[in-house]
Amino acid sequence: MSQNSELRQSFIRFAVEAGVLSFGEFVTKAGRTSPYFFNAGKFSDGALLGQVAQFYAKTLLDSGVQFDMLFGPAYKGITLASATAVALAGMGRNVGFAYNRKEAKDHGEGGSLVGAKLQGRVVIVDDVISAGTSVRESVELIRNAGATPAAVLILMDRMERSGNAVDIGERSAVQDVQAQYGMPVVSIANLDDLLGYLDHAGDPALAGYRAKAAAYRDKYGVSAVV
């Protein structure tokens, strides 16, 4: 197993143990019945957040993406980007980070942006990409500030076609972002990694979800984003 594969499998295992990645029967926002659910909101204490940040930082450095700073879209991205900046500094790569407010302030420092000045090549840090709305807003903010969106860094790529349970699109939200903005989307792990984890989990209860996850992949899935 390559070092990158080990990192991805380590993240899946960590997410399962933290209760962030769970198995059962879940209805997604698109109305699809999924055999797994990824809830990044459960990374809710200092130790878990610190570990997540390490995964983000290592994945970003290993990706080869050239970057000068990080941007965290409100709200989840704020914590994720700031924690990742701390982890990067611990790895010898100290960069600035910024985030946006949902509502601009008209007093104090004012405006909708907080943190380091947006400049150079900016990596957008978020948990997942669903409809791509957060990415679109982030790209606009970054470009309007005179900086360049360099990549999007996410926790999990579901590798799932857009649409709903009946109308299934040709591409995933991640692929749409890459095509529209011409920048890479880097994920710590994806659905293929989840299937690999279930193959070797050694837990009969988990192994039972492997066939369901594979069937879901066959129906709604797309090829992995490289």
From Swiss-Prot:
Originating organism: Ralstonia nicotianae (strain ATCC BAA-1114 / GMI1000)
Single GO term (MF): orotate phosphoribosyltransferase activity
Cofactor or coenzyme needed: Mg(2+)
Official protein name in the record: Orotate phosphoribosyltransferase
GO biological process: 'de novo' pyrimidine nucleobase biosynthetic process; 'de novo' UMP biosynthetic process; pyrimidine ribonucleoside biosynthetic process
Keywords: Glycosyltransferase, Magnesium, Pyrimidine biosynthesis, Transferase
Quaternary data: Homodimer.
Binding sites annotated in the UniProt record for orotate: F37, F38, S130, R158
InterPro entries: OPRT (IPR023031), Or_phspho_trans_dom (IPR004467), PRibTrfase_dom (IPR000836), PRTase-like (IPR029057)
Taxonomy of the source species: Bacteria, Pseudomonadati, Pseudomonadota, Betaproteobacteria, Burkholderiales
HAMAP family given in the database record: PyrE
Biological function: Catalyzes the transfer of a ribosyl phosphate group from 5-phosphoribose 1-diphosphate to orotate, leading to the formation of orotidine monophosphate (OMP).
